[in-house]
Curated annotation (Swiss-Prot):
Domain of life of the native organism: Bacteria
One GO CC annotation: cytosolic large ribosomal subunit
Protein name, as recorded: Large ribosomal subunit protein bL12
The keyword Ribosomal protein is annotated on this UniProt entry: yes
GO BP terms: translation
InterPro entries: Ribosomal_bL12, Ribosomal_bL12_C, Ribosomal_bL12_C/ClpS-like, Ribosomal_bL12_oligo, Ribosomal_bL12_oligo_N_sf
Organism this protein belongs to: Rhodopseudomonas palustris (strain HaA2)
Molecular function in Gene Ontology: mRNA binding; structural constituent of ribosome
Length: 123
């Protein structure tokens, strides 16, 4: 136990440059790479971040469909735009109807617009 404590004390007293040199010497002696160990250790965290679910969505009107008037009415109700602005948005599709909404609201808006006859995408 005393030997281990001496090693800990010796390692604690090393400067950063000495610790880097020690790491190089150990890599050569053991035939390993510290960079590979760091990459392997970081991989699970990166995978967890990739799985993280998107929290903000943009409801995109891809196409008005056959019931353009119904879609215009629904766009007006959702956005609060005037008749001309809503008509321009619908006729200018693909356009964003609402941005920065959560998943639940985005799904609700998508369902409303699709019920009116529009083709909708969530981004």
């Amino acid at each position: 136990m005393a030997d281990l404590q001496k090693i800990v004390d010796d390692l604690s007293s090393l400067t950063v440059l000495e610790a880097a040199e020690l790491a190089k010497l150990l890599e050569e002696k053991w035939g390993v790479s510290a960079a590979a160990a760091v990459a392997v250790a970081a991989a699970p965290g990166a995978a967890a971040a990739a799985v993280e679910e998107k929290t903000e969505f943009t409801v995109m009107l891809a196409a008005a469909g056959d019931k353009k008037i119904e879609v215009i009415k629904e766009v007006r109700a959702i956005t609060g735009l005037g008749l001309k602005e809503a008509k321009d948005l619908v006729e200018g599709a693909p356009k964003p109807v609402k941005e920065g909404v959560n998943k639940e609201e985005a799904d609700k808006l998508k369902a409303q617009l699709e019920k009116a006859g529009a083709k909708v995408e969530l981004k």
